[in-house]
Amino acid sequence: MAKTELDLLIRGSVLLTMREEEAVIENPVVGIRNGKIVLIMQNDLFTEEEYTARKVLDRSNTLIMPGLVNTHTHLAMSCFRGLADDLPLMAWLHEYIFPAEARHVNPEMVYAGSLLAMAEMILSGTTTFCDGYFFVDQVARAAKDAGMRAVVCQGFIDFPTPDTSDPSRQMETAERFIGTWKDASPLIQPALFCHSPYTCSPETLVRIKEAARREKILYVLHLSETREEVSLIQDCYGKRPALHLHNLDVLDPDTLAVHCVWLDEEEQGVLADCGVRVSHTPQSNMKLAAGIAPVPAMQAMGISVSLGTDGSASNNDLDLFREMDSTAKIHKVATGNPAVMDAARVVRMATSEGAGALGLQDRIGSLEVGKAADLIILDLNQPHLTPMYHPFSHLVYAASGADVLTTVIDGNVVMENRKILSFDLEAIMREVEKIAEKIRKSCRK
């Protein structure tokens, strides 16, 4: 009998499917062909006589799990990492970040900064991301070169941007981007990103949402990140931010709201009723002293909450393992309840909930036959991971992105034994250092 040929065969010690049933499989074997998972079983049920593989990854004392999903970031801002810290959000934005972007953001910077950030994500177990920035064709090009799965958002804001000097022509930029990338790669999906209700007029918010609905793509925006934002929107429109957006009819299941730190109970109910999904960014919110989003309350109302890192300039890393740890702990403190945000729930937020937030739940977020082969392999042979009683506990409270040995995206091994295989990381790091030197010189003036 002819053997079934696999592109990749993976063996490990433990596998987390992130399905409701059969969540943990001991001594697993995963078979991959044409970018899809074609078998998952225990090793003692696997027979060498039935299968042959072009490549085998066989490591003892490893954990296999779905790749992590970062539902909110600004990748090219890796070039601004550490430029301005320990500041309130509005001072950070208006005194440092917006001026730096006006001077330095160009296609070359966005490509190099995005690719550097993708290396950081791949090395720390993220396989899919949602990014909002400028010159987004360069973000998409970098994602294609890196082999990452991506939702890439064209940004909108009611003042001149690095890629569009006339705000009234931002939609032309977006239309070109969507036309180029909507069907260019199965791994890349365009989306539209309104910066926030305080930087986008009601007309802009509605116009961009209408375009997103026409194109059947995701609509993303920052929402209620700070108390100051809430007060500003109330003063301008007489409503709290989420109610303002609801009044504009821009909230629906294809809306991803980021931060959501200062939602009151009525606003949470509106988001739940509209099916809006939320990206929680705890480390950025802590660093900017924005506050703690009411995630347990939102989840109790049925709102799907995923995890994002935000950009490197406000975090300052892109390691979702650190976000998981922060998520589990910060809400225990905020609620006074140590049972809130258990480890398994937090891992779901970084995997299956993230996939759902981006509309990719049929493709990624769990390890199942027929789904895309987006997975990571962690090295459990570490002092801080020995012994292991409960895998979810270790992933949230003990592991870090540095424990990821291998990253597979769409069946392709993009990182193996901590080495990026899909592009030249050293060359990109050198390029970003050149960009940073220009930024340093401008800061001295």
Swiss-Prot record:
Its cofactor is Zn(2+). One of its GO terms (molecular function) is S-adenosylhomocysteine deaminase activity. Its EC number is 3.5.4.28, 3.5.4.31. Zn(2+) binds at residues 72, 74, 222, 310. It is an enzyme of class 3 (hydrolase). Substrate binds at residues 101, 195, 225, 310. InterPro entries: Amidohydro-rel, Deaminase_MtaD/DadD, Metal-dep_hydrolase_composite, Metal_Hydrolase, MTA/SAH_deaminase. Keywords: Hydrolase, Metal-binding, Zinc. It catalyses: S-adenosyl-L-homocysteine + H2O + H(+) = S-inosyl-L-homocysteine + NH4(+); S-methyl-5'-thioadenosine + H2O + H(+) = S-methyl-5'-thioinosine + NH4(+). It comes from the Bacteria. Binds 1 zinc ion per subunit. It holds the Pfam family Amidohydro_1. HAMAP family: MTA_SAH_deamin (MF_01281). Belongs to the metallo-dependent hydrolases superfamily. MTA/SAH deaminase family. Catalyzes the deamination of 5-methylthioadenosine and S-adenosyl-L-homocysteine into 5-methylthioinosine and S-inosyl-L-homocysteine, respectively. Is also able to deaminate adenosine. This is 5-methylthioadenosine/S-adenosylhomocysteine deaminase 2.
